[in-house]
C-alpha cells in the first residue's frame, strides 16, 4: 500500500493493467451488478439539478424507474446508489450502436449538463471505501471486465494511467502528480515491498 495524503492506495492500482474495450463488452457494467452505481455525497443532488437535460436521453423504462424510486436509492448495504430498472440495469442507461452507456454522461458530453457521471463509474475498476481517518482505494476485478484487463495488458496501460481524468477529477492535479511519482519510484525499485 502507498499513502498519499489521507488516501491509502493498493499496489494493484500501479501494477495491474486495464483499458475498457467497449467494442467487446458492450457496456455490460451498466447492466450487471447487485445494485446501482454508488453515489458520493451530493451526487444525487447534482443528478436532480441536471435531470431536465439528462431525461431526453433516457429510456422510457429508466424515466419510469426514476419517477417511481427517485434520483437515487439506498441499497441493501445502506449505500446511496442509482435506481435500477426492474432490479437489473441502471435507470440512466442508454443503448446506442449495440452498446450501453450513460444518459448522464451523454448530456454532459453535449455541454448540456454540469455533472459528468457518478465518480464511482468514472473511476472503475477502482473502488473507494471511506473510513474514519482515510480512504482506501482498491482494484476491483469483475469477471465481466476480462476484455479490459486483456486490452490493458496488450497496450501496457496501468489502472492509474487509464483512470487519469477520473483521479484528477476526484483528487486534483497535485495528488495525481504524487501518484505518478510513487509509480515511478515503484517501477525503478526505489520503493520496495516485502511480498
PLM features: residue spans?
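Short loop/turn segments that flank or connect secondary-structure elements
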Residues: 1-195
